[in-house]
Amino acid sequence: PNANAERTPENYCSVSKSTDQAMGRVRELLPEKRRKDAVLAVEYVMTASPEWWKEATPRQQAEFFARSEQWLEKKYGKDRVVAAVVHRDEATPHLSAFVVPLTQDGRLSAKEFIGGRSKMREDQSTYAESVKKLGL
């Protein structure tokens, strides 16, 4: 177990306040017709180095999480980000977010949604740019 139970109360949900609420949002977005093996959500884990977390002020930490969530919403659309949970009970704080991989034409396609290596590299660069002001 990596989580420190004493710090679990410091965790919080900024999108969907419960698993049931998040699943309800997923169901609302899903197309009626879909493959049985379709990926329903893609998880993003967003964090910084342990050293940064030790030096960052509470304000910088809050801004990191806000900017991370904003990056996801700008890239994929606010409606597709169905859950975002800040975990502060582990050695390195992080945001765990779930995004429904809908294509522009309303299909579920994680492959098309995520893209290939070059698109993933581009995503890493644009994300890095979004948190650069925080010294990252």
What are these regions (language model features)?
Residues 1-136:
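N-terminal nicking endonuclease/strand-transfer module with a His-rich metal-binding environment
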